[in-house]
Amino acid sequence: LSSAQDMTSLGISIGADKKVNENKLLGVVLRVGNNDVDVGTYGSSVDTNAISLSLYGSNSLNEDQFLDHIIGVSLLNSDIVRKNSGNTNTQTGDRDGKQIFSSLKFSREFEYNDMNITPKGRMDGSFTHLNAYTEIGNEAIKYNDQDIVSLMTSLGMMIDGDISLENSIVKSRVNLEYGKDFASSSKVVTRYTSDSYTTYSYQANKQDRDILTAGFGFDFNHIQGLTISADYQKQKIISEGSIDTLLLAASFVSKRETEYAMTLEGTDDFAVGLNVAKNINGFNFTIESNYTLMSEIPEYGGNLKISSKF
């Protein structure tokens, strides 16, 4: 199969959080989503439905120490169509899966002269189990159960400070980080249903990856409601290569308290985002849209968020 040609995503999230006390916030989010990916030139596709439940929290251990965490579970169902040569040779299948995921982040702030120095650490992990399934078709393939383990850790430091100007404030920042992506033992094992003696296997991500990240940026905030931001980040994957990312953003809050924002972000392909946000009768409405520029395969999306405090 060749690379993905088209992807359509649709999701609805419903959540709520509560401030338990001055130092703790807890929340829950339920998300139902669909991800439809067309693959290759013959019409192969993977249509996945997922339902996820996440619990999250944010804790202030004291005035300068913070702990954020999230844990969640997902149920997955995929309708798979594999085509080898146009519409004349089609295999179909249905695969179920389960996933558990979590993230833990710790940070501590230190003040030095006019700067804030924040050491931080993070750990992200997930375990996914995909059930075995057998295709239906003339060249059907049987796929064994598959377990996918993902684990990534990082340690870093953020340095930031404010510069006060007439009618405005400039906040600059520098970010340094070391991360490690641990290799997964996940293996895909298959065989053709017409040949029960020969099996095929494939294993990706066989080695650990060390990742170095450095970035800097600033925010310019004017009292008239204008905010301009810029960030540059370079990520070096040892023995593999590097990724450069640039983010430019601008927003303005009008006299009617409507916020308009535009972003430009990307590496080789830049994505443009346009957002509008407004509070109406205690409800925060946000409309988000994005479009990828200079890409052979255009990507575009839209999002509507509604939130309120009770």
PLM region descriptions:
Residues 1-310:
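Membrane translocator/pore-forming domains, dominated by Gram-negative outer-membrane beta-barrels
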